[in-house]
Amino acid sequence: MGQEEELLRIAKKLEKMVARKKTEGALDLLKKLGSWQMSIQLLQTTRIGVAVNGVRKHCSNKEVVALAKVLIRNWKQLLDSPATPKGEKGEERVKAKKKEKGLDCSDWKPETSLSPPRKKRVEEPKDRRDSVDSKSSATSSPKRPSMERSNSSKSKAETPRTPSSPSSPTFAPSVCLLAPCYLTGDSVRDKCVEMLSAALKADDDYKDYGVNCDKMASEIEDHIYQELKSTDMKYRNRVRSRISNLKDPRNPGLRRNVLSGAISAGLIAKMTAEEMASDELRELRNAMTQEAIREHQMAKTGGTTTDLFQCSKCKKKNCTYNQVQTRSADEPMTTFVLCNECGNRWKFC
């Protein structure tokens, strides 16, 4: 077995150790690597440096980590040596071909400030690139100022892409159609005003009231913002609830009351979901509340103990029941049952 095949075998073993998080036997393999005469071509073809560096990062054995650092340091010195090995000449030939095609190595250098994670991922290939870059800098030093200027211009061009505040897909910045007098200077707030105005215009009847919907939406948004003092998630949820209720086709009375002035902008900005609900929904909620109160506040001691009913949860028959007239006199009585074992309640007529 040649040295290259043996290095590939050791590299696979080390990678498996790192993947399984079991580095027993890594010390013997590293000692074996330290006794060999290494070349740049072997480092490049076998990528043994990547495997050793992975052991160095994930192993908890101090002796293994120390030996891995020594090997990596020695191989770095080999890469940085003034003599030009065969592997480096091969890279120079590839570099020359790229230049003939109009490609520049500076276009893909990962050593700018825009890509720091790539430096941490793999150290051995980084060192190989460093040696190639040092070689190219010695032969083409007059081009360095222009390369630095291009890198600085790239970094300047990238800085405006960083968002100043978190944004949700609902309020993503887009072209705003509001009049300049209603713009706030904040893209999130402007988008909210635009969406509130669209909710007020959900039906064509807004024309009958002769109301400026953009102005009214701006006033509603301003009241919300003045109360919450930020455009965080609480602010956005407040705006969403106004929009959904104003656009609800089953609750047109709310939007008409806002358009007519019966509900002011300051009031709609603070109303709860229950207050904005339609009369039909309020009655349904009240009925459900009264039913729940009647079920859960029924006195336990006033019932009759029986074994005629079986609980659906605990499957036992230790129950107490009450019969109450919840509807008209000619309707059958409602039986409320309470399980004395698990507390489960149910009813039937």
Swiss-Prot record:
PROSITE patterns: TFIIS_CENTRAL, TFIIS_N, ZF_TFIIS_1, ZF_TFIIS_2
PTM-bearing positions, type Phosphoserine: S115, S141
Biased composition (Low complexity): 134-144, 160-170
Protein origin, superkingdom: Eukaryota
Compositional bias segments (type: Basic and acidic residues): 101-110, 121-133
Domain TFIIS N-terminal: 5-82
Alphabetized SMART domains for the sequence: TFS2M, TFS2N, ZnF_C2C2
Annotated keywords: DNA-binding, Metal-binding, Nucleus, Phosphoprotein, Transcription, Transcription regulation, Zinc, Zinc-finger
UniProt: Zn(2+) binding residues: C311, C314, C339, C342
Gene Ontology molecular function: any one: zinc ion binding
Zn finger intervals (TFIIS-type): 307-347
GO cellular component, one term: nucleus
Any single Pfam family the record assigns to this protein: Zn_ribbon_TFIIS
One GO process term, biological-process aspect: transcription elongation by RNA polymerase II
Disulfide cross-links: none
Region named Disordered: 80-170
Residue ranges of domain TFIIS central in the record: 188-304
Subcellular locations according to the entry: Nucleus
Family to which the UniProt record says this protein belongs: Belongs to the TFS-II family.
Main function: Necessary for efficient RNA polymerase II transcription elongation past template-encoded arresting sites. The arresting sites in DNA have the property of trapping a certain fraction of elongating RNA polymerases that pass through, resulting in locked ternary complexes. Cleavage of the nascent transcript by S-II allows the resumption of elongation from the new 3'-terminus.
Name assigned to this protein: Transcription elongation factor A protein 3
